[in-house]
Amino acid sequence: MVIRPAGFVVALTVVIAGARAGTQAPQAPSETQMPAAISLPPAFDRVLRDYEAAWRDGDGPRLAALFTEDGFAVQSGSPIRRGRAAIAGGITKPGGSLQLTAYAYSSSGTVGYIIGGYRYPTTVGAGGRFVLALQSGPDGHWLIAADLDNSGPRAR
């Protein structure tokens, strides 16, 4: 079964709403304090570690293979890229030792998400933030349907 982008957004909204139902909102971290890191299930953690490795190596095709065929990459300071070819074309050189940390995740059926932060060893301040919308592929592996990130608050 192929979930179209509109259907995926509806399904992801249901997952997020379900994950939030009946829970109290945690205390918001300060501008420079990041939420506590959490451990992910192995299948979700694999997505983050494979992303880090492909980014570090500047391997656009390998990074793009982590996405659904029509996936989106929406990154600070870059045009929106849709599809594996566009995503692969956006990575042309090694990106450094990217460190991804998960703060929250959820899944239901074939959709899920990871909310987290990113930084490099030399990052000053809080670092950036990301949301990965995930979809389970035909082989059961989780693929990125959308990667949304921003650079986060500026270091003071």
Predicted regions located by residue number:
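Positively charged n-region of N-terminal signal peptides that target proteins for export
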Residues: 1-5
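Surface-exposed, charged secondary-structure patches
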Residues: 86-127
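Short hydrophobic/aromatic-rich beta-strand segments that constitute the beta-sheet cores
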Residues: 73-74, 114, 144
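Short beta-strand edge/turn micro-motifs at domain boundaries
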Residues: 26, 127-156
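A short gly/proline-enriched turn/hairpin at secondary-structure junctions
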Residues: 66, 70-81
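Short beta-strand segments enriched in hydrophobic/aromatic residues
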Residues: 67, 118-120, 148-150
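Bacterial N-terminal signal peptides
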Residues: 7-17
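Short, low-complexity N-terminal intrinsically disordered segments enriched in polar/charged residues
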Residues: 20-69, 155-156
